[in-house]
């Protein structure tokens, strides 16, 4: 196993099975964040993650963190909160604001640089990257974004500026995703937060098998059309 240097003249990636064990999943470096390369990466179970000012690093960890939408864990307190939620939830209304929110609301710093913001915004304009927005009145207070691969959604990041805002985004999205044929959410690497929401780890080979099947699936043509998913009860 060795770290592969990508060429700017080819969007090809090495097999994820060749990724390093330590650091877990590091597969390649270099290349660029062009839409074609990003889409090729997601189709192969690979994602970018790197520090500002450093070379682009590409990862495919083993095990892989995933969330089966029907297994989303909602605490009793969250269920009570959602019943009287003051939030309105939309899809693809404000992709730029959501990714900017994910970039700026990180006390420990962020990998979401200006170049990353621009790259995913291009994916959004091409219909591949999508956002869920949580509004309190007319203020954006939380949200999440990711990349669609058929009936699998690759979650990238979320943010919250008010109580339970990001959890609301995930809850409403999971309900909508399941009801329209969505199968699986990729969480990349397990952490305490995603584990508390019901995410689990599966072997990389299993994730790649699911990906190869699900990316060929189709949600309804109008699923990603900008629309309101949830409104507070009056």
Swiss-Prot record:
Query: Gene3D superfamilies, from UniProt?
Result: Leucyl/phenylalanyl-tRNA-protein transferase, C-terminal domain, Leucyl/phenylalanyl-tRNA-protein transferase, N-terminal domain
What keywords are assigned to this protein?
Acyltransferase, Cytoplasm, Transferase
Q: Which reaction does it catalyse?
A: N-terminal L-lysyl-[protein] + L-leucyl-tRNA(Leu) = N-terminal L-leucyl-L-lysyl-[protein] + tRNA(Leu) + H(+); N-terminal L-arginyl-[protein] + L-leucyl-tRNA(Leu) = N-terminal L-leucyl-L-arginyl-[protein] + tRNA(Leu) + H(+); L-phenylalanyl-tRNA(Phe) + an N-terminal L-alpha-aminoacyl-[protein] = an N-terminal L-phenylalanyl-L-alpha-aminoacyl-[protein] + tRNA(Phe)
Asked if the Swiss-Prot or TrEMBL record annotates the protein with the keyword Transferase, the reply is yes
> Transmembrane region positions?
none
Q: Which InterPro entries match?
A: Acyl_CoA_acyltransferase, Leu/Phe-tRNA_Trfase, Leu/Phe-tRNA_Trfase_C, Leu/Phe-tRNA_Trfase_N
Q: What is its EC number?
A: 2.3.2.6
As for subcellular location, the record says: Cytoplasm
Q: Which Pfam families does this chain map to?
A: Leu_Phe_trans
EC top class, in one word?
Answer: transferase
A GO biological process this protein is involved in?
Answer: protein catabolic process
Name the source's superkingdom.
Bacteria
Q: Look up the record and report any one GO term of the cellular component aspect.
A: cytoplasm
The UniProt family comment states: Belongs to the L/F-transferase family.
> What's its job?
Functions in the N-end rule pathway of protein degradation where it conjugates Leu, Phe and, less efficiently, Met from aminoacyl-tRNAs to the N-termini of proteins containing an N-terminal arginine or lysine.
The UniProt entry, under HAMAP family, shows:
Leu_Phe_trans (MF_00688)
Q: What is this protein called?
A: Leucyl/phenylalanyl-tRNA--protein transferase
Organism source for this protein? Shigella sonnei (strain Ss046)
């Amino acid at each position: 196993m060795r770290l592969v240097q990508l060429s700017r003249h080819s969007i090809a990636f090495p097999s994820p099975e060749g990724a390093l064990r330590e650091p877990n999943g590091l597969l390649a470096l270099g290349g660029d964040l062009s839409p074609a390369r990003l889409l090729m990466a997601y189709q192969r179970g690979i994602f970018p993650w790197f520090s500002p000012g450093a070379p682009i690093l590409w990862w495919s960890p083993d095990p892989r963190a995933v969330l089966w939408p029907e297994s989303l864990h909602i605490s009793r307190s969250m269920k009570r909160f959602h019943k009287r939620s003051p939030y309105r939830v939309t899809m693809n209304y404000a992709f730029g604001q959501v990714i900017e929110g994910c970039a700026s609301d990180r006390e420990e710093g962020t990998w979401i640089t200006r170049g990353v913001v621009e790259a995913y915004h291009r994916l959004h304009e091409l219909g591949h990257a999508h956002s869920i927005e949580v509004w309190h009145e007319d203020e954006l207070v939380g949200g999440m974004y990711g990349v669609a691969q058929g009936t699998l959604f690759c979650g990238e990041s979320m943010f919250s500026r008010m109580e339970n805002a990001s959890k609301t985004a995930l809850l409403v999205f999971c309900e909508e995703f399941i009801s329209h044929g969505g199968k699986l959410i990729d969480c990349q690497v397990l952490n305490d937060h995603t584990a508390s929401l019901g995410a689990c780890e599966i072997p990389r080979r299993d994730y790649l098998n699911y990906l190869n099947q699900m990316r060929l699936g189709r949600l309804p043509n109008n699923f990603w059309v900008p629309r309101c998913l949830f409104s507070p009860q009056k």
